[in-house]
């Protein structure tokens, strides 16, 4: 699930993804790609 948060590295996606109720995500194409909680 993509989140429109600009990122350079995956660490920048930690808080935005958690705030969205998901797990830590990866940085893909300059935006955070969050992993849904399973």
UniProtKB/Swiss-Prot annotation:
One of its GO terms (molecular function) is toxin activity. It is found in: Secreted. Expressed by the venom gland. Disulfide bonds join 7-27, 13-32, 17-34. Pfam families: Toxin_2. Its main location: secreted. InterPro entries: Scorpion_toxin-like_sf, Scorpion_toxinS_K_inh. It comes from the Eukaryota. One of its GO terms (cellular component) is extracellular region. Coiled coil: none annotated. Keywords: Disulfide bond, Ion channel impairing toxin, Neurotoxin, Potassium channel impairing toxin, Secreted, Toxin, Voltage-gated potassium channel impairing toxin. Has the structural arrangement of an alpha-helix connected to antiparallel beta-sheets by disulfide bonds (CS-alpha/beta). Blocks voltage-gated potassium (Kv) channel and augments neurite extension via NGF/TrkA signaling pathway. Belongs to the short scorpion toxin superfamily. Potassium channel inhibitor family. Alpha-KTx 03 subfamily. This is Toxin BmK NSPK. It comes from Olivierus martensii (Manchurian scorpion).
